[in-house]
Amino acid sequence: MALLNQVRASTTVPYEGYVEARGRIGLPDVPRAGRVVALLGETTRMRAYVAGPERWRVDELTPIGERDLYHEPWGTTLWDSGERRAVSTVGEAAVRFARPADLLPPELGRRVAAAAEPGEARRLPPRRVAGVEAVGLRITPRSPETTVGRVDLWADPRSGLPLRVELTARGAATPILTAAFLDLRRRAPAPDLLRFYPPDDAEVQTDPSPDLAREIDRFSPFVLPDLLAGQPRRTRVARAASTYGR
């Protein structure tokens, strides 16, 4: 399907915009699991400035301040305006916790489109999103093992950039995760917006990239099988930490 391929190819499309993501996924509060529970169970408000896959900035807006994530080819910098602290991380681990930027409609939409198989996608009626008459697509996974019932997305007809994504669990009537632009400017952000300039009172530190998979492999006596719950292992080497399925 042409629209599906257009969504997959939209990784280099620049944009600026305001996004709201609403999650209704109930997860237990796991210690040291980052902000995964809040991201998937609450409303996350973000401003996004994206020049491309290697240079972007996403500001998470909270009642007490902002948490701004700057991504450049060398790594990332997280600035917490409430704590007045900046942490730069060199590189990026193969396995990491979810972060607000993962909930942007283009990120969610492209991830789903990349995993879709032939015959799983069909067109939906258009929908107006952030001032754009967006074209719709429904992806319904065929695998009986998945808990995802369907994913509906609407994209910019010119660029294929996903503007709204709704994920509905199997057997559910309403989405458990929705992410959508409320405001969108289809242009490249100014270079200065993508560079972090620490304030004079900021505490600045640099951390190595946390490789969770490596730490699990280091201490676990177990190696996961090639097949788990009917899904093949995606990682090439058998390890204690692996990913499976699509």
Question: Which residue stretches match the model-derived regions?
Answer:
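Extracytoplasmic
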Residues: 12, 43-45, 53, 64, ...
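One face of beta-strands
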Residues: 15-21, 46-48, 54-60, 67, ...
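Accessory, solvent-exposed terminal regions and/or long lumenal/extracellular loops of proteins
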Residues: 42-43, 195-246
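Short, mixed charged/polar active-site loops
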Residues: 43-45, 66-68, 86, 148-150, ...
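Short, solvent-exposed coil/turn segments at beta-strand boundaries
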Residues: 50-56, 71-76, 82, 132, ...
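Gly/Pro-enriched, hydrophobic low-complexity segments
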Residues: 59, 122-202
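Long, acidic/polar, low-complexity amphipathic helices and coiled-coil-like
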Residues: 64-66, 73-156, 165
